[in-house]
Amino acid sequence: MYAIVRDRGMQYRVEEGQALDIALLDAEPGSEIELGDVLLIGGEQPRVGTPTVDGAKVVATVLGTIKGDKIVVFRYKNKKRYRRRTGHRQEYTRVSISKIIVDADEQHVTGSMEGETNGA
């Protein structure tokens, strides 16, 4: 069982127990967050949202914050001896997917990934 969720403009394919790095959140480590924009629930009977699946949500536990890889920006002006080298490291929040809930009545869904194919 997997789900496609949307969080602040990014889409993620998530499964239960998976660790995921999302854009920085103002949340304490150990707290639970809810990803409500579920676009698709995959499994034996996939459900596609229009645009979201009604009543579906993904609950995740915040593990902490991390920094991404450094991006180096180098600017220069040709023939003028002007050079500037700066770097940037984006901060992310690492979360662990606790459960995928399909219906609003808190029905917890479990399932295996056997027999499913990756469309990518």
From Swiss-Prot:
The keyword rRNA processing does not apply. Keywords: Ribonucleoprotein, Ribosomal protein, RNA-binding, rRNA-binding. GO terms for biological process: translation. It comes from the Bacteria. Disulfide bonds: none annotated. Belongs to the bacterial ribosomal protein bL21 family. Part of the 50S ribosomal subunit. Contacts protein L20. This is Large ribosomal subunit protein bL21. It comes from Roseiflexus sp. (strain RS-1). The lineage of its organism: Bacteria, Bacillati, Chloroflexota, Chloroflexia, Chloroflexales.
